[in-house]
Swiss-Prot record:
Active site: 107
Organism lineage: Bacteria, Pseudomonadati, Pseudomonadota, Betaproteobacteria, Rhodocyclales
Protein name: Ketol-acid reductoisomerase (NADP(+))
Details of cofactor binding: Binds 2 magnesium ions per subunit.
Cellular-component GO terms for this entry: cytosol
Organism: Aromatoleum aromaticum (strain DSM 19018 / LMG 30748 / EbN1)
Length: 338
């Protein structure tokens, strides 16, 4: 697999173009500020009534309504929640984007599942940093960058890949390394990872472990520490150096228990469930479910969110985290502000 770095990208390609970033959330604020600091001409497209307008202005960015911002752009990067992109694209972007411009995304969901069918005259690319927006920005400010993916869906100009690399470089990505993929692969692997491992799998594993201990009469506080709190310590070791690095760092007792019990808990039945989840993603069945859920204002997701919030692990966790002020001091998300 080829990895692209600074030497492989021509930053001048993007410096000569007008770029519009639609959205100013986690990724939007990072892309807009990084590209501006790289010497690019950047406009942010937002709703004037939105809370992000003043934040973008305070950062010294040119901010306009989406339709106006798009009309002057050579490159339009849409950085909105998946469910909001089709409406904004068809109402504000497609009627106003210039002939032969470049349309860019940071996730392939809407293009891959045909919720957005870009005009035939456009270059369509993806530039997807593999990290949250605050990390994309902070690494850039340190002189580094977050590894990124690029992909080309339509190449009408013959230069779409070069433009994607140039954009990634301006965003700091070629400092960390850029890997080429395609919209299908990025979308399907991203959804699978979220559903089977990172969000769905991890959350259910933590809750089930907590419930098993408390149902057996153990203190909820002990169950929280053993099944949720310490998970970060293990994940950090894997994140830093892989599974072998984690096993090197833990006790022999913990490692032996991993080998004996891990395959009993996460077993062939789990693998079959993962394969079924992947099949739903590959066939578009999951996408249809998510789109229909959105059209009915997310009744199932809202109900499950309430159930999760009411789970005993949330109550005991809140009490225990109050005993650890360093957690609040270093919070990644402050729900009172964002």
């Amino acid at each position: 697999m080829k990895v692209y770095y600074d030497k492989d990208a021509d930053l001048s390609l993007i410096k000569g173009k007008q770029i519009t970033i639609v959205g100013y959330g986690s990724q939007g604020h990072a892309h807009a500020q990084n590209l501006k600091d790289s010497g690019c001409k950047v406009t942010v497209g937002l709703r004037k009534s939105g809370a992000s307008w003043k934040k973008a202005e305070a950062a010294g960015l040119d901010v306009r309504e989406v339709a106006e911002a798009v009309s002057n752009a050579d490159i339009v990067m849409i950085l909105l929640p998946d469910e909001n992109i089709p409406g904004v694209y068809y109402n504000d972007v497609e009627p106003n984007i210039k002939q032969g411009a470049t349309l860019a995304f940071a996730h392939g969901f809407n293009v891959h599942y045909n919720q957005v069918v870009p005009r035939d005259d456009l270059d369509v690319i993806m530039v997807a940093p593999k990290g949250p927006g605050h990390t994309v920005r902070s690494e850039y400010l340190k002189g580094g960058g977050v590894p990124s993916l690029i992909a080309v869906h339509q190449d009408r100009s013959g230069k779409a890949k070069d433009i994607a690399l140039s954009y990634a470089a301006a965003n700091g990505g070629t400092k960390g390394g850029v890997i080429e993929t395609n919209f299908r692969e990025e979308t399907e692997t991203d959804l699978f990872g979220e559903q089977a491992v990172l969000c769905g799998g991890a959350v259910e594993l933590v809750k089930m472990g907590f419930e098993t201990l408390t149902e057996a009469g153990y203190a909820p506080e002990m169950a929280y520490f053993e099944c949720l709190h310490e998970l970060k310590l293990i994940v950090d070791l894997m994140y830093e150096g892989g599974i072998a690095n984690m096993n090197y760092s833990i006790s022999n007792n913990a490692e032996y228990g991993e080998y004996v019990t891990g395959p009993e808990v996460i077993n062939e039945q789990s693998r079959e469930a993962m394969r079924a989840a992947l099949k739903r993603i590959q066939t578009g069945e999951y996408a249809k479910m998510f789109i229909q859920e959105g059209r009915t204002n997310y009744p199932s997701m809202t109900a499950r969110r309430r159930l999760n919030a009411a789970h005993p692990i949330e109550q005991v966790g809140g009490q225990l985290r109050d005993m650890m002020p360093w957690i609040k001091k270093n919070k990644l998300v402050d729900q009172s502000k964002n």
